[in-house]
Amino acid sequence: MKAAWPLLLCIALLPEPSSSLAQSEDLATKSQRAKEFMAEGKFAEAIPLYSELNHALPNNPGLLLNLGMALHMAGDERKSIPQLEAAVKLDPKLGPAWLFLGAARLQLGDALEAVEPLRAVLRLQPDHQEARLMLAGALLSLERNAEAAQEYRKLADLSPASSPAWYGLGRSYEALSIRAFHQLEKTAPESAYWLALVAEARLRQQQFTSAFYLYRRALENSPAMLGLHEAVAEIYRQTGHPDWASVEEEKERKLSPPDCHSHTFECDFQEGHFERVIAAATEANPEESYYWRSRAYNELALNAFARLGQMPPSAEQHEIKAHIYSSQKKYIEAAEEWRQALKFSPGDRQIREQLAISLKFSQDYGGALLLFQDLLRTDPESTQLNYLVGDTLLELQRVEEATPFLRQVVARDPKSQAAHKSLARAYLAAGKSADAIPHLKAALATDEDGSLHYELGRAYQAHGQLALARQMLSQYQEIHSKQEAEKQSLNQEMQITPPDER
């Protein structure tokens, strides 16, 4: 928002009523000087002048707007909001005041409160692209993904060359696809529909063995489900078994084709009528509905991202690549894409945070820490950033420095299991097993490999609570043994084997 200030100044620097300013040559001089400061980007210098003008001429919506705008552009969002609220109260048709009010609330992370001011701008000026982009972003951050998609779609129609519009549209559709998948997972976990979606995702990530295993399980559940044999054939082709692929293709051909006269999901999907699939899926049974909606939204997302890829280089293109690399756990490559994105948007906090996270996951803890600390300086109340700084310091074995940050996070958000886990690690590293115990207990629900049960058992031992120690260590053994058995079973099952004779 702030990067676009020259454009917005053209809208927002409204002339104050000449009759008022004519009362005093001094006020007119101050007004002119304040405008010059704003045009030069010297927002802090303009603030005292606009404050004096507002004191001399109270309840002037134009002056309130300009003071609020100067405060916003100088980075003082909290002080800008009352001025902008007063301006729109006096003049509800003052579009620029609504715009800056929405922008200020977004800067403070209050997306919910930003929505109505931005909608007010669009009621006054429906083709205002900056307002629509901010509104769409606010809705997406609130997980109101269908509404966000509508706004991004309108923006893409207004400006087909807008990279942010296509990127946002793709992200909205992607979120809708994921939501439909999670609804399917709740409704029918382990169903053929669910297995097929997970397998499709693994195949896109070139995890061929895992995808093969899941497609085979889906076929066991639903042998007549269209597309499964063809997907298995694709895995065979990708892994160097063209003869096996031919067998699976023949099995697919023997299945009864869909009756396309009745507009089946399969036919509409194959013909690229994804909106029709989504609309029709609302009338289907839940399993089928969630399956087809997830697939259709995913295709719409891919189409939007493909459109983005055809445009000149942009931050959004690098963000897409960074997310893909992250999903593949290629964090060094992801970090490089975030660096490239940052060249297009040097002040973008979200990009800087994502770069730091990628650096952390790639074990460049020193580089990550510098970025996290810099972000925290401008947002010291952020629970997320305090946690990331503390956890990164812990990875660097700077335990004494890490502990205060992690304590602060746990105090603010007692339900944060990640923070409890990190704080427990810090206490254990410092030899404070008694202090670690309550935090290990709070984080036990996240223990996938038994390590937290083991650490808690050791902490109980050190603290002399031997019965509890035996209980925790016994549970650790159970978890560990079960996990090893499952791992061995999966290793046997997850092999790319020849086609069944059936």
PLM segments and residue spans:
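Helix-start (N-cap) detector for alpha-helical repeat units in TPR-like alpha-solenoids
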Residues: 27, 61-62, 95-96, 129-130, ...
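Structural marker of alpha-solenoid helical repeat scaffolds
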Residues: 56, 90, 124, 158, ...
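Canonical positions in the second alpha-helix
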Residues: 52-53, 86-87, 120-121, 154-155, ...
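Register position in tetratricopeptide repeats
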Residues: 39-40, 73-74, 107-108, 141-142, ...
